[in-house]
């Protein structure tokens, strides 16, 4: 299974990079992981322009492949780790070999992105910094594959 994390901006904090490196290493036996960092347009005067520019970059990435696209979104579906593990197994069983997880920038994504994905996934009612969300997502991806492979990680 190919897992692509499509995200906006670069990670600036060492502790987040360290966590990302750790979970990336753990996943090598389960998946081929690719983290695609797109340009952050946060410095624009107009937030809507920033959102549109970042969203255009996301749309370019997801149109390049025949992947299943999952957007992390506050309006998405809430699902627990066990059921998400089953969901991914079902995707594999129907022939999907690549999943794009999309983390928008700090200002969110456009309606075009929201309308172009296969699933919107909500992690929590809480709001997380988008850079920290990358680490949280990688931990969960590892957890989902650990569950489906009967690895003693998930409790």
From Swiss-Prot:
The keyword Transferase applies. It catalyses: pseudouridine(1915) in 23S rRNA + S-adenosyl-L-methionine = N(3)-methylpseudouridine(1915) in 23S rRNA + S-adenosyl-L-homocysteine + H(+). Its main location: cytoplasm. InterPro entries: Alpha/beta_knot_MTases, RlmH-like, tRNA_m1G_MTases_N. It is found in: Cytoplasm. It comes from the Bacteria. Disulfide bonds: none annotated. Its EC number is 2.1.1.177. GO terms for cellular component: cytoplasm. S-adenosyl-L-methionine binds at residues 72, 104. GO terms for molecular function: rRNA (pseudouridine-N3-)-methyltransferase activity. It holds the Pfam family SPOUT_MTase. Specifically methylates the pseudouridine at position 1915 (m3Psi1915) in 23S rRNA. Homodimer. HAMAP family: 23SrRNA_methyltr_H. This is Ribosomal RNA large subunit methyltransferase H. The lineage of its organism: Bacteria, Fusobacteriati, Fusobacteriota, Fusobacteriia, Fusobacteriales. The gene is rlmH.
């Amino acid at each position: 299974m190919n897992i692509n994390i499509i995200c906006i901006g670069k990670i600036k904090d060492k502790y987040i990079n360290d966590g990302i490196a750790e979970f990336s290493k753990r996943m090598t036996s389960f998946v081929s992981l690719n983290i695609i960092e797109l340009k952050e347009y946060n410095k624009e005067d107009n937030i809507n322009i920033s959102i549109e520019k970042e969203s255009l970059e996301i749309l370019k990435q997801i149109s390049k492949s025949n992947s299943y696209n999952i957007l992390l979104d506050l309006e998405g579906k809430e699902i627990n780790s066990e059921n998400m593990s089953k969901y991914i197994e079902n995707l594999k069983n129907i022939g999907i070999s690549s999943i794009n997880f999309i983390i928008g920038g700090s200002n969110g994504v456009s309606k075009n992105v929201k309308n172009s994905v296969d699933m919107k996934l909500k992690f929590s009612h809480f709001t997380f910094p988008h850079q920290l969300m990358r680490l949280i997502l990688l931990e969960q991806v590892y957890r989902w594959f650990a569950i489906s492979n009967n690895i003693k990680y998930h409790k």
